[in-house]
Amino acid sequence: MSHGGGGHAAELYPEEQIFAVGIALSLVGCYLANFLSPYGLGMLIGGLLASAACVAGANTVRKVAAYGLGTGVPSIGMVSLGMGTLAAVAGVLIPDYFNLPYLVAPIITLIVSAVIGYIVGRLTVNPVGMKIPIMVRSMTFLSIAGAMALLGFTVAYVGSLEPQKYIDYALNNGMMALAFIAAGMAILHPFNACLGPNESHKRTLTLAVACGFITWFVFSVVKLDIVSIIVSIILWAIVYVKFVKMSFKDACAVLHVPEIPKKEE
């Protein structure tokens, strides 16, 4: 049975597996961005691995939206980043407040995002009353994915997990707002674009990877990291071309729009 109003299309890989891999890669990416930044590799490695959190989040959106959220697909993506923003900021600032090593920030972000996601998930079930059996788990997963995507891309940009640097170069200059929108689109867009009677897990995941790469490209441009700009746009083009070919193959018909007439007939 296909997506788009209920039911589940066949999964290539279990949701838990994709989520675990995506979050693990983004967690490692936060640390590598911190340590490799002095060598000019923070955005190249950190940005690449941060995109994995976007894929994990997009896959969870696909899972929960299959229960019939309808126009709620973009909304739940924004909720993911709303929860993630709180968790990412808390994860960076809590170590400073309690005099803990700042390198524990990604771990604290994971913990805080899981707690926030669980609480929001419980509230959506009661008192809001959304009768989706996987809602609590999905909101927890989305909160974690949103937080790790935000933290991953912003740390890759800042080049450090040190609280004051993060405040100056991720919060005070508005980079967190860019991360909110860019990562949010990367998480909500894949299933929103692919849902329908013939949705396939492979095609949705392919677009999710492309969205992760284009988010990485955006941050590379803002940071003016030439190597990351070139690598990210090449990887995006490769994956996106693959997605377009898959879409043509799966479509029942492909209708090309004719050239607009130069003058009225």
Curated annotation (Swiss-Prot):
Involved pathway(s): One-carbon metabolism; methanogenesis from CO(2); methyl-coenzyme M from 5,10-methylene-5,6,7,8-tetrahydromethanopterin: step 2/2
Membrane topology reported for the UniProt record: Multi-pass membrane protein
MF GO annotations: tetrahydromethanopterin S-methyltransferase activity
Keywords in alphabetical order: Cell membrane, Membrane, Methanogenesis, Methyltransferase, One-carbon metabolism, Transferase, Translocase, Transmembrane, Transmembrane helix
EC assignment: 7.2.1.4
GO biological process: methanogenesis, from carbon dioxide; methylation; one-carbon metabolic process
Ranges annotated as spanning the membrane: 18-38, 41-61, 75-95, 100-120, 141-161, 175-195, 202-222, 224-244
Group of enzyme by EC: translocase
Known catalytic reactions: 5-methyl-5,6,7,8-tetrahydromethanopterin + coenzyme M + 2 Na(+)(in) = 5,6,7,8-tetrahydromethanopterin + methyl-coenzyme M + 2 Na(+)(out)
Protein family (similarity comment): Belongs to the MtrC family.
Function noted in UniProt: Part of a complex that catalyzes the formation of methyl-coenzyme M and tetrahydromethanopterin from coenzyme M and methyl-tetrahydromethanopterin. This is an energy-conserving, sodium-ion translocating step.
Protein name: Tetrahydromethanopterin S-methyltransferase subunit C
Organism encoding this protein: Methanocaldococcus jannaschii (strain ATCC 43067 / DSM 2661 / JAL-1 / JCM 10045 / NBRC 100440) (Methanococcus jannaschii)
Source taxonomy: Archaea, Methanobacteriati, Methanobacteriota, Methanomada group, Methanococci
